[in-house]
Amino acid sequence: MLVYSKRMLEIILENIVTAPEGLGLPAVYAESDVLLYRQYGRYDTVAVQREGRQLLKRAEALQAEYDITALPRLAKQYAEWSKKLQQLKFKRLLHGEFAAGKGITLYVNAIRQEGAEHGWDYVAYYASVLVHERVHLLHYQAVLAHFGAAGAAVQSAEYKQAQRYWYGRQTEAAQAAVVKETLAEFARWLWCLQQGQHSIAQALLQTIEEARTCIPHYPYAGVRGLRALHASSPQAAVRAYSELWQLSLTSWQQAYARIKEL
């Protein structure tokens, strides 16, 4: 049970890291056996470029000003813009990633480059990336535990079922990505606040605000709702975070629907 008299970050970190059984994890938290360091990572093709943000503003203005369903010409233009928004992507270096069954990889030169460009402390930014990836690891372990696959052989039916669920089935995959990144990035944002790394925390929010939901199921968009809830009621944000975590162990669709309500 969460104790709401504590500070927001302490509650979340305690229940994710030092008391993982409270969120469906085994009593003993097993750190990844593999923590790899590489120079540069592969490119992430999810984030939205400048043209996408401009198109979204135009589409939103159009929707706000007109009843597009009653105006065929404008409805067609709106549909064309919406379709184009789904195709707009740009490349950026990944700073870290978690791979199920393989562990965490941190791309040190990409992290160093990003920190230098913004004047951030390298160690602090590095640690924030690691926090994000560790939450992914803990989340994955929670899924394994839920399906009875913690410590199970990779050939076992339980393990295979957990793996299929973790990656999401067909259309669920995009929703699963949103839920995973929301849980990991919000914890990272809170960690930055606790450590006094406010410029990093603010930059994380700016990235989310700029991207918004230009691409349907944009993975980091869900953090906006939790952050807004935290601003009005840290306790409510704690409850929403814990609820989201629990829902994610049984249904990506329900967890994603909960994010949309924030």
Spans of model-derived segments:
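N-terminal low-structure segments adjacent to metalloprotease catalytic domains
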Residues: 1-68, 123, 141, 145, ...
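Short amphipathic alpha-helical segments that mediate assembly, nucleic-acid/protein binding
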Residues: 9, 48, 52-55, 68, ...
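Active-site scaffold of zinc-dependent metalloenzymes
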Residues: 54-125, 134-141, 145-148, 153-155
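Post-HEXXH active-site segment of zinc metalloproteases
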Residues: 124, 140-181
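A conserved beta-strand element that flanks and buttresses the S-adenosyl-L-methionine
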Residues: 130
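An active-site-proximal "capping" alpha-helix that borders the catalytic cofactor pocket
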Residues: 177-193
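Pan-zinc metallopeptidase signature
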Residues: 190-262
